[in-house]
């Protein structure tokens, strides 16, 4: 059997599929390589592009769907710990999206045969941006994030965001697939034939090498936007290593004891701390609610203990907690509305009675925190509730806190995975980004590093220091250029006191045009596919339908 025939066989397609899934998962943080392997990312998509090239139309849809389900299933396996339904939802939607994407890749290659390499690369990049949008937005798995530790290369994100890094990572896969595909389809497969296939794409390869070289040299020469600190701030990041989802007043009291112990340890050794940060939902009882409505005496008492504790200190506290209000329904009844909140308490100012500055989480996790289609799909909403989904109301205001002259914002949980959110905070005056998260439920180091990899890009894009206080990790301090300044050991209680640089100037092209490059990839790929389809139809009409 010839190599080309073998590659087009079911066994060949299956092996390409397995290789594609494996390389995608290994490129990003995973159980085998908790920090991922950045080098593998440059060829991770080549097996998929070859599979699309050689498979028939129906097979392309099948393998695309299978690739979506298995690649994202392997990538985000930790969702199973949260709930099997969550993993099924991600795998299911990924299967649908990748089936459609692979069909688009096949069409793009057929419509623009001579330029198939660039067209397929563009279509993939357009997909990566599109999959971060809307209710189903899922930024995990963007290829650019695999390079989070390659600091000289990713400094270009300060101008064009993560999308330019993705372009640099995806192109070699498309190039390699094009060269290998051309070589396999030759009648003679020897070194000369391979070099001939590679030579036919030498211009695009040279441009890619030049762009990568420029990015690295520009970083070494300091050409990218300046991130010189004007002042510094000392922040205590508390990592209790608990699990707020356990529930029960005794569990909440035990977590509170751990939080206060770690905070006291930090404040005794570093009395000049500017801010103490507790993670997302670190204190579960609704502070303002239980202080106002004292029906649950044990919760009220725990709230009083918290307020007395904070008011006795000499520095502000950011506390991740539930926040609730009474709201009148359309039927005229009153109901409680819950928010996932970050609360700023300043001792002697807004602690007793509690009237903290508030930020309510705007970008909620689909299906597990938020489902806006209750009236359209009431049966599915009820199903999610029975699966222990915790629904929150959606916040609407981008809040910039201010304490001791420091202006900062607090993206909650996976909000630091979306560039437009942190960009908006910085546009409104934030000079420090403080992320509070709870990834403890996943019990996965690779999950925590996947989250961290995206946070690194948010720091670079905005040229702002970003600190993370996470329940079980990764609790880190990130410099404006993406360097990890310090990091706590994961899955252990501790507190990280970080002295971080504060940049106040508006610097970096990303601050001005945001995700414009991602939008361009998306719009351009749609235009090229439509133009290619029209061009193909016109040619068929001229040649006669057969």
From Swiss-Prot:
<dbReference type="InterPro" id="IPR045378">
    <property type="entry name" value="LNT_N"/>
</dbReference>
<feature type="transmembrane region" description="Helical">
    <location>
        <begin position="194"/>
        <end position="214"/>
    </location>
</feature>
<feature type="transmembrane region" description="Helical">
    <location>
        <begin position="122"/>
        <end position="142"/>
    </location>
</feature>
<dbReference type="Pfam" id="PF20154">
    <property type="entry name" value="LNT_N"/>
</dbReference>
<dbReference type="GO" id="GO:0042158">
    <property type="term" value="P:lipoprotein biosynthetic process"/>
</dbReference>
<feature type="transmembrane region" description="Helical">
    <location>
        <begin position="62"/>
        <end position="82"/>
    </location>
</feature>
<dbReference type="InterPro" id="IPR003010">
    <property type="entry name" value="C-N_Hydrolase"/>
</dbReference>
<dbReference type="GO" id="GO:0016410">
    <property type="term" value="F:N-acyltransferase activity"/>
</dbReference>
<comment type="pathway">
    <text>Protein modification; lipoprotein biosynthesis (N-acyl transfer).</text>
</comment>
<feature type="active site" description="Proton acceptor">
    <location>
        <position position="280"/>
    </location>
</feature>
<protein>
    <recommendedName>
        <fullName>Apolipoprotein N-acyltransferase 1</fullName>
        <ecNumber>2.3.1.269</ecNumber>
    </recommendedName>
</protein>
<feature type="transmembrane region" description="Helical">
    <location>
        <begin position="14"/>
        <end position="34"/>
    </location>
</feature>
<comment type="function">
    <text>Catalyzes the phospholipid dependent N-acylation of the N-terminal cysteine of apolipoprotein, the last step in lipoprotein maturation.</text>
</comment>
<feature type="active site">
    <location>
        <position position="361"/>
    </location>
</feature>
<feature type="transmembrane region" description="Helical">
    <location>
        <begin position="514"/>
        <end position="534"/>
    </location>
</feature>
<feature type="transmembrane region" description="Helical">
    <location>
        <begin position="151"/>
        <end position="171"/>
    </location>
</feature>
<keyword id="KW-0012">Acyltransferase</keyword>
<dbReference type="Pfam" id="PF00795">
    <property type="entry name" value="CN_hydrolase"/>
</dbReference>
<keyword id="KW-0812">Transmembrane</keyword>
<dbReference type="GO" id="GO:0005886">
    <property type="term" value="C:plasma membrane"/>
</dbReference>
<feature type="active site" description="Nucleophile">
    <location>
        <position position="413"/>
    </location>
</feature>
<keyword id="KW-0472">Membrane</keyword>
<keyword id="KW-0808">Transferase</keyword>
<feature type="transmembrane region" description="Helical">
    <location>
        <begin position="85"/>
        <end position="105"/>
    </location>
</feature>
<dbReference type="InterPro" id="IPR004563">
    <property type="entry name" value="Apolipo_AcylTrfase"/>
</dbReference>
<feature type="domain" description="CN hydrolase">
    <location>
        <begin position="233"/>
        <end position="502"/>
    </location>
</feature>
<keyword id="KW-1133">Transmembrane helix</keyword>
<comment type="similarity">
    <text>Belongs to the CN hydrolase family. Apolipoprotein N-acyltransferase subfamily.</text>
</comment>
<keyword id="KW-1003">Cell membrane</keyword>
<keyword id="KW-0997">Cell inner membrane</keyword>
<feature type="transmembrane region" description="Helical">
    <location>
        <begin position="41"/>
        <end position="61"/>
    </location>
</feature>
<dbReference type="InterPro" id="IPR036526">
    <property type="entry name" value="C-N_Hydrolase_sf"/>
</dbReference>
């Amino acid at each position: 059997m010839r190599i080309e025939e073998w590659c087009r066989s079911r066994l060949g397609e299956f092996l390409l599929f397995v290789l594609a899934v494996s390389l995608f998962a290994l490129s990003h943080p995973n159980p085998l390589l908790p920090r991922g392997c950045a080098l593998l990312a440059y060829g991770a998509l080549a097996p998929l592009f070859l599979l699309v090239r050689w498979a028939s139309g129906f097979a392309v849809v099948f393998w695309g769907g299978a690739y979506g389900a298995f690649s994202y299933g392997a990538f985000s396996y930790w969702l199973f710990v949260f709930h099997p339904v969550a993993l099924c939802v991600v795998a299911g939607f990924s299967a649908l999206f990748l089936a459609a994407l692979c069909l688009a890749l096949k069409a793009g290659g057929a419509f623009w045969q001579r330029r198939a390499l660039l067209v397929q690369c563009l279509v993939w990049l357009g997909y990566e941006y599109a999959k971060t949008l809307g209710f189903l937005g899922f930024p995990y798995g963007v290829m650019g994030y695999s390079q989070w530790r390659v600091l000289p290369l990713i400094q270009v994100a300060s101008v064009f965001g993560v999308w330019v890094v993705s372009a640099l990572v995806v192109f070699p896969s498309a190039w390699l697939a094009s060269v290998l595909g051309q070589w396999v389809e030759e009648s003679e497969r020897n070194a000369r034939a391979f070099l001939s296939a590679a030579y036919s794409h030498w211009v695009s390869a040279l441009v890619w090498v030049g762009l990568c070289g420029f990015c690295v040299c520009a970083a070494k020469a300091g050409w990218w936007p300046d991130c010189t600190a004007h002042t510094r701030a000392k922040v205590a990041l508390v990592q209790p290593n608990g699990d707020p989802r356990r529930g029960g007043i005794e569990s909440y009291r035990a977590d509170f004891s751990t939080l206060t112990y770690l905070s006291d340890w930090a404040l005794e050794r570093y009395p000049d701390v500017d801010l103490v940060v507790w993670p997302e939902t670190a204190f579960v009882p609704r502070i303002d609610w239980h202080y106002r409505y004292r029906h649950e005496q044990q919760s009220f008492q725990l709230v009083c203990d918290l307020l007395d504790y904070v008011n006795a200190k000499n520095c502000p506290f950011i506390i991740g907690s539930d926040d609730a209000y009474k709201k009148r329904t359309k039927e005229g009844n009153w109901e409680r509305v819950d928010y996932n909140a970050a609360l700023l308490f300043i001792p002697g100012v807004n602690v007793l009675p509690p009237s903290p500055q508030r930020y309510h989480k705007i970008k909620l996790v689909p299906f597990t925190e938020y489902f806006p289609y209750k009236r359209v799909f009431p049966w599915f909403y009820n199903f999610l509730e029975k699966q222990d989904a915790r629904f929150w109301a959606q916040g609407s205001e981008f809040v910039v806190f201010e304490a001791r002259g420091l202006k900062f914002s607090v993206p909650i949980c996976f909000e630091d995975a979306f560039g437009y959110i942190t960009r908006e905070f910085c546009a409104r005056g934030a000079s420090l980004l403080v992320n509070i998260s709870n990834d403890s439920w996943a019990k996965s180091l690779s999950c925590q590093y996947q989250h961290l990899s995206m946070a690194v890009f948010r720091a670079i894009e905005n040229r702002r220091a970003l600190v993370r206080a996470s329940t079980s990790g990764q609790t880190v301090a990130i410099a404006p250029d993406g360097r990890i300044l310090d990091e706590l050991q994961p899955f252990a209680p501790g507190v990280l006191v970080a002295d971080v640089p504060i940049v106040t100037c508006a610097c970096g092209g990303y601050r001005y045009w945001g995700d414009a490059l991602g939008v361009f990839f998306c719009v351009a790929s749609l235009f090229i596919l439509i133009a290619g389809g029209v061009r193909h139809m016109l040619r068929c009409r001229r040649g006669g339908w057969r």
